[in-house]
Amino acid sequence: MMMSSRSSVSLGVLLLLAVILSAGAADPDILTDFVVPSDTDPSGIDGAFFTYKNLVTGNSGDPAKLTVTKATHAEFPALLGQSVSYAALVFGAGTVNPPHIHPRASELLVVVQGPLLVGLVDAARNGTVYTQTLQTGDMFVFPKGMVHFQFNNGTDVVARAFSAFGSATPGTISLPAALFGSGIDDTILDKSMHTDQATVDQLKQDQAPPSPRPSPGSSSSAAAALLPSRWAITLLLCFAASYYFYF
């Protein structure tokens, strides 16, 4: 009976842990309708605070390259706490958005000028790759944290798309840059990729180290600090519960 009771309580603790972790994975909740940056006078807030005009005008880069213009909290402070952000993408002919992940958000992409080849990797199904050639008006969802890519395989046509994210700071981790531009020891890369030093050197050649992101304002830092706090509290609860019910 004691073991059954402990098992039931342990199951309850695990379920509670799952709920806490699920809540911590999203953007931190805010207690107001919107967040005013610490360097902004609330009495001066007007419609301009909720307006962002650079998504399209800032997206007229080199048509032979991939150009990504973001509207995240870093560019559009009014998004803090709103769990949403946006990006405009212009794919020159033959350009690719390399395999990458967004650790904090799902992505919903809509093509406004196609075609555009997209794909994602399902690690839970032995690395199955799902691809689709999208035409103008088509949409595609990339679940949070899954490796995905976009490729304009046309020879003379520019492709354009917009992406919505379920976080004000979705984050982007480019796999080529993370592996070959981050300073990981060459021996580790050699052994991990089952290749040789010459191949690793060649792969590193075009991967410059990622630029550090600017430090966010104090309001952003305070909100972002909620997430680590939740993890710390969760771990403490877990250890405490395990100790209590074991002994």
From Swiss-Prot:
SUPFAM superfamilies: RmlC-like cupins (SSF51182)
Pfam families per the UniProt record, alphabetical: Cupin_1 (PF00190)
Nucleotidyltransferase is among the record's keywords: no
Keyword Plastid: no
UniProt subcellular location: Secreted, Extracellular space, Apoplast
Signal peptide segment: 1-25
Positions bearing carbohydrate: N126, N153
Residues that, per the record, bind Mn(2+): H100, H102, E107, H148
Primary site of residence: secreted
Keywords from the named record: Apoplast, Glycoprotein, Manganese, Metal-binding, Secreted, Signal
Cited CDD domains: cupin_OxOx (cd02241)
Domain Cupin type-1 per the UniProt entry, residue ranges: 53-201
GO cellular component: a single term: apoplast
One Gene Ontology molecular-function label: manganese ion binding
Family stated for the protein in its record: Belongs to the germin family.
Purpose: May play a role in plant defense. Probably has no oxalate oxidase activity even if the active site is conserved.
Cross-referenced PANTHER family: GERMIN-LIKE PROTEIN SUBFAMILY 3 MEMBER 3
Subunit structure of this chain's protein: Oligomer (believed to be a pentamer but probably hexamer).
Name of the protein described by the UniProt record: Germin-like protein 9-1
Organism, scientific name: Oryza sativa subsp. japonica
